[in-house]
C-alpha cells in the first residue's frame, strides 16, 4: 500500500490502514486510529460536478459513493453507513453496469459538488492597521495593503479600521473627503451602542440604496447603511487608496522610558462588532496588523512603562504575568464571537518584540486564520507572505474558502473521539460519538470560518461498543466519509466528499503492523502532544510521549526479554523513534529559548500542516553540497554531517539556512569564485541557492532565510536542531569522531543514547 498515492488522490493518511477488530488489540496498538485529512487538497484529476449530490435519508445523510451497493434492476442503492435502502433519483434512470455515474466509479473516492444554494454575500476583507509605528513601517504596511487590493476579486467587499492611541473606523463610501469615526480605547462599547454611534441601528442599516453584485451568480446584495464602511473594492478602490496614502503615524508623543499607546484589543472588538452587524454568518476575514503589543484598553498585554518587560514562559507558568489571564480571557471570548459569526482573523506581526500572539492565538486558531511572524513590515517575510495569502488557482479564484463545516460519518464498529486542528466543535452530536475524548470532542462536526488547500486536520477514532461484544456480529469493513461544506471564492457553495474504506482484522498482528504509517503517526502524536500542552507542562507531555513510544516498541518490536541487543523494529517502524527523538527536542516542546509568541506561532503552524510539512517541522531536512556531490544529497541531521569542505542546506520549515564549512567560507572570502579557473566553486556556492528558490515556491508563510559560516553566531540555528552525536569528545554511532566533525557543546542526550535507553526499557519483562 503506497500511502503517498492515497494522499495524492484523497488528501488523507491514516496511522493504521488496517484496524484491530477488538478493543483489547486496539488498546495494545498504543497509537489511536487517526487520519490526517486535508479537505481542500489540490488534485488535478478530481472532477467538479455542477449538481447537488445524492444523499441518504435523514438522519444519516451520507453521500452516494463508490462503496454503495447499487441494484440496477430495482433502482435503489444501499448506504454502507446505515444500511438504508434509497431510491435512485430520476436523472439516474438510464444508468447501467457499463454506464455508471461518476460518483460510483472506483476512482471517485473524492468528489466535489457545486451546490445550488445561493451565497449570502461575496467575501469580506476588513483591514485593521496599526498606526502606532514609525513612518517607514507605516509606509511599508500601506504599500502592502495597496498591493493586496489589486489581488482581490472585483466584487470583494473591503473596509478599513486604523488604531494607535485611538481607533478610527473609516468611511470609505464618503468620497468628498476622508471621514472617520473615532473611538476611545478605554470604553467597552456594546454592539448596540456601536450601532447607534455608527448610525447602523434600526432602519438606518437599510436606509441606503447601495447595492453590490456577486459575480457569477446574478445575485444582488443590498448593503444598506453599512456601505459607508464596507464596499466592493471595484467601487471604492480609488477613495480607499487616497485614505491609505494620507495615513500618518500616530501623532501622540511617546515620553522617554515608555511604550507607544496601542489599543489592539479594542480595535479588534470594534472590527468584530462591525462585521457582526453588517455581515453576520457571511464569509469574512479580518486582516489584523500589529506593530507592537497592546498597551492600553481591552486586551492589554503589557503596560506602557518600558521597565515592565514582556511576559516570559516562566512568568506565565508561575502565574506572575500581570495582564496575561485577563487578556487571554478577553481574546478567547472575542474568538468565540468571531467563530459564531463565521468570521476569521489573520494576524500579521511586524515587530522585533512580542506583540501578544499567545494572548490572541484563539482569535486565529478558532477561526481558521493565519499567523505571520516577522521582525518588521519592511521585510520580505511579511510582504511576500501577505501577498501569498491572496494567491489564486488556475481559474483565477482565491485559494481560500469561507464558512466551512467538516462533518465525519462512520460505519458500524467505528466511533469518533475528536479533532485536533484550527476550528471549533459544533453543537451537533451524531450516533457515532465515542466516550473517549481526544482534542475537540463530543461532536462529529466542526466549523472553520476560513479554510485553504493547506489546512489539515487530525481526526481520531475508536472502536464502537459492539466490537467488544463477542456475541455480536462484528463488521469486517469500516467506512469513513468526510463532508466539507464551504463557500468558494467564486461565489458558490461547494461540498467536498471523501469516502474511504479499511478492513477490520482479528488476531492478525502481522497485517496490522504492516499497515502502520509511521510518518502519519508522528504527525498525529505531535498534535496530541500540543493539545496536551494546553493543560499540562512540557515535561509531563514529554514523559507521556516517551511512555507511549516504549509501549509501542514492546508490542511491535522483535526481541528477547532482558536482551537489548536482540531488539529489532520492522521497516515501517524504524523511523518512528527518530521522529519522536526530534519532536522532544523541537521548539514545540523544548521552549527554553523561545518567547511565548514564538511558541504560539510554531504550534499554530504544526496544527495546520499536512504530514509532509509536519515532518519537516519535527525533523528538518539537511542536504550536503560538495565538489563530489555538487547537486546536493540528503545527509543525516547529525553533527557528523558538518565538515569544513561542504555546504549544508537546512530546512526547518520556519528557517532555511545555508551553512558554509570553514574551508568553503575561507575560499569564498578570498574571492576564488570570481576567478575563471575556480568556476566549480562558483557553481557550488550557487547550487543551494537554486534549491532555496524551489523550496520557497509555495511555502506559507515565507521562512526566514539565513546564510552563515561554520563558527559564526548564526550557525546556532543549525546546531540547535542536529543530533549532537559528537559532543564533549563522544564519538558518533554513524562514524568515528574525526578532527573534521563539529563538536556540539550541549547536555542534550543524543540519538544513540536515546535508542539505547529505548531498547533497554522495551525488553524489560
From Swiss-Prot:
The keyword Zinc applies. Pfam families: Gelsolin, Sec23_BS, Sec23_helical, Sec23_trunk, zf-Sec23_Sec24. Zn(2+) binds at residues 56, 60, 79, 82. Keywords: Cytoplasm, Cytoplasmic vesicle, Endoplasmic reticulum, ER-Golgi transport, Golgi apparatus, Membrane, Metal-binding, Phosphoprotein, Protein transport, Transport, Zinc. Its main location: cytoplasm. Gene3D superfamilies: beta-sandwich domain of Sec23/24 (2.60.40.1670), Sec23/Sec24 helical domain (1.20.120.730), Severin (3.40.20.10), von Willebrand factor, type A domain (3.40.50.410), Zn-finger domain of Sec23/24 (2.30.30.380). GO terms for biological process: COPII-coated vesicle cargo loading; ERAD pathway; intracellular protein transport. It is a peripheral membrane protein. It is found in: Cytoplasm; Cytoplasmic vesicle, COPII-coated vesicle membrane; Endoplasmic reticulum membrane; Golgi apparatus membrane. The modification Phosphoserine is found at residues 565-566. InterPro entries: ADF-H/Gelsolin-like_dom_sf, Gelsolin-like_dom, Gelsolin-like_dom_sf, Sec23, Sec23/24_helical_dom, Sec23/24_helical_dom_sf, Sec23/24_trunk_dom, Sec23_24_beta_S. One of its GO terms (cellular component) is nucleus. It comes from the Eukaryota. One of its GO terms (molecular function) is GTPase activator activity. Component of the coat protein complex II (COPII) which promotes the formation of transport vesicles from the endoplasmic reticulum (ER). The coat has two main functions, the physical deformation of the endoplasmic reticulum membrane into vesicles and the selection of cargo molecules. PANTHER family: PROTEIN TRANSPORT PROTEIN SEC23. Belongs to the SEC23/SEC24 family. SEC23 subfamily. The COPII coat is composed of at least 5 proteins: the sec23/24 complex, the sec13/31 complex, and the protein sar1. This is Protein transport protein sec23-2.
